[in-house]
Amino acid sequence: MDPPLVNDSSFSAANPSSYTLSEIWPFPVNDAVRSGLRLAVNSGRVFTRSEHSGNKDVSAAEESTVTDLTAGWGSRKTRDLNSEDDSSKMVSSSSSGNELKESGDKKRKLCGSESGNGDGSMRPEGETSSGGGGSKATEQKNKPEPPKDYIHVRARRGQATDRHSLAERARREKISEKMTALQDIIPGCNKIIGKALVLDEIINYIQSLQRQVEFLSMKLEVVNSGASTGPTIGVFPSGDLGTLPIDVHRTIYEQQEANETRVSQPEWLHMQVDGNFNRTT
């Protein structure tokens, strides 16, 4: 068999003062990495002192140093990730805080505009820019409504709401309006209370007017008949004819008939005389 290439006696004790940490690890070193390197150096010292330990102990020491180094590097990565997460959280929290502030400012502006509309001190931007919007709205409100084709009747409790009953109520309302107009025309009718009494008063007043019209028509007939007759009636003035009694009218008519007979009688006698004379001859 060939002799082993490497013997335990060929390894010499390592001198830690002959090298530095910056030469071995050029990257920035954390506390975990330093602790791992220290463990590695200490394990090397233990390895040099123990001459009877085998290759298994050397491999175990190497594995421990590697695990320590990887653990330090992983802790650094986790710290970097944690710092990134914290920074992202801070940014998100600051952005959310700014959004909340902006939304709060908008709400305050809206609330202030709504509360200021009543006093006129604060107005929204649309009204301030338009200027005449408020006046147009007031003009539209002040415009009279167009006449409606239908009749609005308010139904009370217990009243029917069908078309027939609504039309009947509308008819009664029109009648009441006409009665109020007649009350204003007829003297003393405003003092009467009750529709029945008002109707009686209106009927009595209309009947009295009808009688007066009939009497005046009779007067006109008498005046017209007197104007068509001879000058005998001209002795009486026209204004006094209406006040004369009925007997006077009869005497006037009898005188007229007598005058007509007097005028017509000699003509009739003359005709008879002429006829007799002709026969005798």
Swiss-Prot record:
One of its GO terms (molecular function) is DNA-binding transcription factor activity. Gene3D superfamilies: Helix-loop-helix DNA-binding domain. Keywords: DNA-binding, Nucleus, Transcription, Transcription regulation. The keyword Hydrolase does not apply. It is found in: Nucleus. GO terms for cellular component: nucleus. One of its GO terms (biological process) is regulation of DNA-templated transcription. Residues 47-167 are annotated as: Disordered. Residues 77-88, 138-152 have a biased composition (Basic and acidic residues). InterPro entries: bHLH_dom (IPR011598), bHLH_ZIP_TF (IPR024097), HLH_DNA-bd_sf (IPR036638). The keyword Transcription applies. Residues 159-209 form the bHLH domain. Homodimer. This is Transcription factor bHLH79. The gene is BHLH79.
